[in-house]
Amino acid sequence: MTSALLSLSALLAASALAVPAAGAAPRNDKPAAAPAGWETVDGPELARFAGADGRAQAPAAAGRSASARADDSGTFALKSVRNGKFTATEKNYAAPNTGVLRARSAAVTGAWEGFAFEWHEATQTYALKSLANNRYVAVEGNYAGNSQNILRARSTGAGTWERFTLYYNEDLDRWALQSALNGRFVAMENSYTGSLQYALRARSLEVTGSWEQFELFEITG
């Protein structure tokens, strides 16, 4: 398996807000087997990718907690293949969308676009902690409508809601995330409008194309 940690560009974008409806019980589907052409990447493998990659890396993101965990596999930025934008934590959005994740930044400019990937050996999954607000990313399985299964950095601890399997496709040089809560792959909602445009949701049964594919950039410094 070769590394897919890439180099960066420049500039950022802004954001606003929206209010999703609550309701609907979360799905507890067992995560599917690795899709054809994709393989799971564990914590040690991801750490080796970060250390061995020869290409340029993202600039350091300010605001990372000093109490990095021993099982921290690295700090990364997620770039959507669908729209070419980096994922940011909307920490200034009002409830119930505070901390929603959107692929809306043209560049990694700081903590907004940074996420610590924490490997959990017992479950063979990752928890993603936002550097913007020091909260873990959760899948909102109880939200309804277009906001169901949206990703928000809002948790102080990591359980099933906050755990993901990381996949890599060597032929495509792309990454994908699968929620442990509902077994769905994370997709970027390119067709949404308003303040939830480009939001990330765990809603796809499989990796069908660029909607579910991401590039991974290591943040160093």
Labelled PLM ranges:
Residues R27-G221:
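Lectin-like carbohydrate-binding module/patch detector with strong preference for beta-trefoil
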Residues M1-P26:
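Secretory targeting and sorting signals
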